[in-house]
Amino acid sequence: MNNKNHLKIATRQSPLALWQANYVKDRLTALYPDLQVELVTMVTKGDVILDTPLAKIGGKGLFVKELEHALLNHEADIAVHSMKDVPMEFPQGLGLSVICKREDPRDAFVSNKYRSLAELPQGAIVGTSSLRRQCQLKSLRPDLDIRSLRGNVGTRLSKLDNGDYDAIILASAGLIRLGMAERIASFIETDISLPAAGQGAVGIECRVDDELVQSLLAPLAHQETTICVLAERAMNNRLQGGCQVPIGGFAQVKNGEVFLRALVGATDGSQIIRAEGKSAVENAEVLGVQIAEDLLQQGADKILKSVYQD
């Protein structure tokens, strides 16, 4: 940072990524009126390869690596991410500074013809880029024709509007943030479609030795969201899952305890393994590991191994 009054935010160029970066910018400038905040936009591997399902591209950090290079090269001071895209392991010298307050974590059912999953006719075509959503949909409705759907939110909605799909499944948070909540035909409750770890939360990454930036970011942290996302990510990490695997994890804080539900599913929906538990909030990450161990004891590793081999 130059003279402690200029901060650069690395961000992807999609409308949702820019919304998230501007959200952080607005929070910071409200706190520090003399701070100049600049967005540095860039394209990631996940943005470029749009003709291949995410799970087939391979690797972790498809939407963050280029942003991390900018941090390491001092071309930016912070990077703003959707938490569900952030790998557990960070490059040396970088780390997660804060997790902001979570938006609605549920999946959204979006259709121009039908109001809910239950209304979909036999063999309806449903678009999703997520193996997690696919396995839960297939378990609930084996008759559905699940097809890959890539691109930013606007692109996906256009494909629906063009008649390529009867319905598509998106994260509610993205639609709400982009002012498109009216496109949500219905919210899919978490007992029907368990969200991805970190879904709906925004995280900020920075250089670990940049104490000034860390102190500037500290007021943006949301304690309850942080507890929940840390539990979810600890579970995901123990399962060695990235963001392109059929793993769901969702935590909630109630009465001073954190409750975590998680699942691992075969992509065809033929098998879904579930686990849940609770602990004191200070043990959120320990709980995440325990829930993952429960899933592994039930055979989650065999399911995940078959997914990686596909």
From Swiss-Prot:
Quaternary structure (record): Monomer.
Domain of life: Bacteria
PROSITE patterns for the chain: PORPHOBILINOGEN_DEAM
Family: Belongs to the HMBS family.
Protein name listed in UniProt: Porphobilinogen deaminase
CDD domains: PBP2_EcHMBS_like
Gene name tied to this protein: hemC
Note: The porphobilinogen subunits are added to the dipyrromethane group.
Cofactor section: dipyrromethane
Pathway entry: Porphyrin-containing compound metabolism; protoporphyrin-IX biosynthesis; coproporphyrinogen-III from 5-aminolevulinate: step 2/4
UniProt GO molecular function: hydroxymethylbilane synthase activity
InterPro entries, per the entry: HemC, Porphobilin_deaminase_cofac_BS, Porphobilin_deaminase_N, Porphobilinogen_deaminase_C, Porphobilinogen_deaminase_C_sf
Organism of provenance: Mannheimia succiniciproducens (strain KCTC 0769BP / MBEL55E)
